[in-house]
Amino acid sequence: MNITVRIFAPVAFLSALTAAGPLAVSNGTVSFTAKGNMGMSCDGSTSAVKVDEDASAYTVTVQTGTLDSKLELRDKHIKERFLETPKFPTSVIVIDKACLALPESGDKAGECPGTFTLHGQTKPATVKFKAKVAGKVTEIDASFTAHMAQHGIEEVKWAMVKIKDDVEVHAKLTVTR
């Protein structure tokens, strides 16, 4: 499941802030919602996020083994059978800094292209974001849709319940510069 993807994308929207100093990410949460047949929905989240920056991009990495859907057996199946976390322990999103231009204060919304790596396969991703800048603190709300089949993840199903291929990934971050 492409749950971890969300955390990565929002951090990328902070490139304009780096000129003012280093960034510290706090209160970061990445969540996912996977919908299935028969009205089924599976939600999960993690707060384990690592952000790296170079001259051209932000790279956000999440340990896929930290995802928690509040149901131990389901988590075990997701991590072992579908995400194969021993073989693919992380998911990564990379966003180009050139796309990001946050104001010194106020709000901004937009979309940025990037790449998302899950299950060892890297594919394009478009991240929608909203940012609120107040002094040295920026709150970011970002999301994108991850497609399991594009990342080589087999159809997710348990008994008669099947999960749709599109998984919504969402991240909320507070960043201080």
Listing of model-derived features with the role each one plays in the protein:
Residues 8-18:
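Bacterial N-terminal signal peptides
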Residues 19-177:
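Low-complexity, acidic/polar, glycine-enriched regions of mature
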Residues 1-9:
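Bacterial N-terminal signal peptides that target proteins for export
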